[in-house]
């Protein structure tokens, strides 16, 4: 690949740092999960950075940004590349700033953690749970592979949003430390109203180098699957449980048939094609309340609970069937699947879902996540599965 003089000069100035020379590694680090969208796949698949550099601390981040600014080289921030909107793609080549070495938990105590952006979500929990008995309030379904910086910079909510709402809501981020890209980079700290300027900004207006986030008490969550052949009953199951004041949940997902049978390999032997599925994570001290609620709703079937089951093979973590993992599992079976992102607000969320079902019968497969909305009421985030045909039809 022929590189511009600007890129060559920037690479030379940064050669004492961890600069990657292998093209396969550069190409890999240049990509996020944009390929979830067939529209983005055709537009972004060819994009690749000119070089990749991995800073080990904030001082090196400042040096990289200063050098790239001086040489007019574009910078794209990389956590783990699991975002699926194409928001972290090197549109103009340039430098990918990979934060994998900045992966330390700096401090944790009950209720809060201070952490570097390259720390994996699972590693934040792995550190905090034994150290202070608390865990992240919410995380993406890519908990095992995504970074905390990428989640805050590119995510909006996820597992835990049924209780805590979205990341943008007051109290779900405490503080962000950011380095700007300019002739003399500045180190800025954002709190309160200012947080919205840099959270969910994809690293486009500054590089997050430190995060302070709230934690919640950690539990050995019980992972459960419930089925019903009646769509309204399945949808209402997640809705009602999310509104039960005494039952603590981490996730409440609803999957319209035939999702479980067609796309969830380890669940498929235990469901019929007509079964709608509800995925739940229930706090252990809430199980008695949950089972009492189920007994009042005898038409719902508890087919799996992680603490007491006879399945030949564990289905794994229930949240790895929810949020964007639903689409990922469907894509493994049918590469033409994509999804639509919809928000169904309280109090009309169930009616609006059914209007959508009625408007596109047989064309859309509903996938809902119960979330606490801005007003504290429970509604649904929709990640509706759809088979891609044409861009016109998708629009």
Name what the model sees in each region.
Residues 106, 121-122, 126-246, 252:
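FAD-binding subdomain of flavoenzyme oxidoreductases
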Residues 1-66, 82-111, 259, 263-267, ...:
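N-terminal flexible segment immediately upstream of the FAD-binding catalytic core
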Residues 37-38, 159-163, 191-198, 208-212, ...:
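Glycine-rich, charged/polar anion/phosphate-binding loops
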Residues 51-56, 222-227, 279:
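Short, well-ordered beta-strand elements within core beta-sheets of diverse protein domains
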């Amino acid at each position: 690949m022929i590189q511009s003089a600007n890129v060559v000069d920037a690479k030379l100035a940064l050669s004492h740092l961890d600069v990657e020379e292998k093209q396969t590694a550069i190409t890999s680090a240049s990509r996020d999960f944009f390929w979830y969208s067939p529209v983005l796949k055709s537009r972004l698949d060819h994009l690749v950075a000119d070089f990749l550099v991995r800073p080990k601390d904030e001082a090196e981040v400042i040096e990289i940004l200063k050098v790239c600014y001086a040489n007019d080289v574009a910078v794209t921030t990389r956590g783990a590349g699991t975002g699926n909107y194409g928001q972290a793609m090197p549109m103009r080549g340039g430098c990918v700033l990979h934060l994998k070495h900045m992966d330390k938990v700096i401090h944790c105590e009950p209720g809060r953690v201070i952490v570097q952006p390259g720390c994996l979500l699972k590693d934040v929990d792995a550190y905090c749970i034994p150290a202070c008995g608390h865990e992240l309030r919410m995380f993406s379904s890519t908990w095992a592979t995504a970074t905390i910086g990428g989640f805050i910079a590119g995510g909006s909510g996820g597992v835990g949003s049924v209780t805590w709402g979205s990341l943008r809501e007051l109290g779900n981020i405490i503080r962000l430390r950011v380095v700007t890209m300019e002739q003399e980079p500045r180190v800025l700290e954002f709190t309160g109203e200012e947080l919205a300027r840099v959270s969910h900004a994809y690293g486009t207006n500054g590089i997050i180098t430190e995060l302070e986030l709230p934690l919640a008490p950690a539990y050995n969550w019980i992972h459960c699957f419930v089925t019903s052949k009646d769509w309204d009953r399945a949808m209402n199951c997640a809705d009602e449980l999310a509104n039960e004041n005494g039952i603590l949940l981490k996730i409440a997902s609803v999957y319209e048939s035939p999702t479980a049978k067609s796309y969830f390999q380890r669940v498929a032997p235990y469901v019929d094609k007509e079964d709608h599925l509800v995925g739940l994570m229930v706090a252990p001290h809430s199980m008695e309340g949950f089972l009492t609620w189920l007994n009042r709703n005898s038409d719902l079937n508890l087919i799996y609970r992680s603490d007491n089951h006879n399945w030949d093979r564990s289905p794994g973590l229930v949240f790895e069937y929810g949020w964007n993992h639903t689409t990922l599992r469907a894509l493994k079976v049918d590469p033409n699947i994509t999804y639509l992102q919809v928000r169904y607000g309280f109090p009309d969320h169930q009616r609006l879902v059914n209007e959508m079902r009625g408007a596109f019968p047989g064309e859309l497969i509903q996938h809902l996540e119960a979330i606490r909305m801005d007003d504290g009421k429970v509604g649904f985030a929709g990640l509706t599965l759809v088979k891609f045909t044409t861009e016109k039809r998708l629009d």
